[in-house]
């Protein structure tokens, strides 16, 4: 598990270094089969808990959210922080429980993340280009980009922002 607000990945762990990892929750050595990594720290699966309701977040498939130094379950995150802001395309509010797409710091509803030319929805796995505030599918990227006169700011395969750590 990785903090969604952090671009850092956990440091590599080798078999010989397992005994050196300490749990951020209890301070004990982690000898578990799996290491959990959230908020730049390692955790026992039993110690990674919601700061509000104490629900265990270390189970496979359980999402956790981090904000303001707290680790939260989905329900408490939504209760405390409401929505994700406004969609950069339509300007409407985005509920915190809704999946979003992001490009260059802008946030979009899934339905609003569309090519500026053909209006087709861009979905996870699609390649896209973000140029001067506009989204373009691979097919409709500007001619200047194809000819090498512009640089695409974003041309990686698209992945949804699920806000999981």
Swiss-Prot record:
SUPFAM superfamilies: Glucocorticoid receptor-like (DNA-binding domain) (SSF57716). GO terms for biological process: motor neuron axon guidance; negative regulation of protein-containing complex assembly; negative regulation of transcription by RNA polymerase II; neural tube closure; positive regulation of kinase activity; positive regulation of transcription by RNA polymerase II; regulation of cell activation; regulation of cell fate specification. Keywords: LIM domain, Metal-binding, Repeat, Transcription, Transcription regulation, Zinc. Disulfide bonds: none annotated. PROSITE patterns: LIM_DOMAIN_1 (PS00478), LIM_DOMAIN_2 (PS50023). InterPro entries: LMO_RBTN_TF, Znf_LIM. GO terms for molecular function: DNA-binding transcription factor binding; metal ion binding; transcription corepressor activity. It comes from the Eukaryota. One of its GO terms (cellular component) is cell leading edge. Disruption phenotype: Overall patterning of ventral spinal cord neurons is normal at 12.5 dpc and 14.5 dpc, but there are additional ectopic V2 interneurons (V2-INs) at all axial levels of the spinal cord; phenotype exacerbated in an MNX1 mutant background. In an MNX1 mutant background, genes typically expressed in V2-INs expressed ectopically in motor neurons (MNs). Abnormal guidance of motor axons in an MNX1 mutant background. The keyword ATP-binding does not apply. Expressed in a wide variety of tissues. Residues 23-83, 87-147 form the LIM zinc-binding domain. Pfam families: LIM. Transcription cofactor. Plays a role in establishing motor neuron identity, in concert with MNX1, acting, at least in part, to disrupt LDB1-LHX3 complexes thereby negatively modulating interneuron genes in motor neurons. Interacts strongly with LDBS. Interacts with LDB2 and LDB1. Interaction with complexes consisting of at least LDB1 and LHX3 acts to disassemble the complex; may preferentially disassemble LDB1-LHX3 complexes rather than complexes consisting of LDB1, LHX3 and ISL1. Interacts (via the LIM zinc-binding domain 1) with RBBP8. Interacts with both RPPB8 and LDB1 through the same face and cannot bind to both proteins simultaneously. Interacts with BRCA1 (via the BRCT domains); the interaction represses BRCA1 transcriptional activity. Interacts with DEAF1; LMO4 blocks export from nucleus. This is LIM domain transcription factor LMO4. It comes from Mus musculus (Mouse). The gene is Lmo4.
């Amino acid at each position: 598990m990785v903090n969604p607000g952090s671009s850092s990945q956990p440091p590599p762990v080798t078999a010989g270094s397992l005994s050196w990892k300490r749990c951020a929750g209890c301070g004990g050595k982690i000898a578990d089969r799996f290491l959990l990594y959230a908020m730049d720290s390692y955790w026992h699966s039993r110690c990674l808990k919601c700061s509000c309701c104490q629900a265990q977040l270390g189970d496979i498939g359980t999402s956790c959210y981090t904000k303001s130094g707290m680790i939260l379950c989905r329900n408490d995150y939504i209760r405390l922080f409401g929505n994700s802001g406004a969609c950069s395309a339509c300007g409407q509010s985005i509920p915190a429980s809704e999946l979003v797409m992001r490009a260059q710091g802008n946030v979009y509803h899934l339905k609003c993340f569309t090519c500026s030319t053909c209006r087709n929805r861009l979905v996870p796995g699609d390649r896209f280009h973000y140029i001067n505030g506009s989204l373009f599918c691979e097919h409709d990227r500007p001619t200047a980009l194809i000819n090498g006169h512009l640089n695409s700011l974003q041309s990686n395969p698209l992945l949804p922002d699920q806000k999981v750590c």
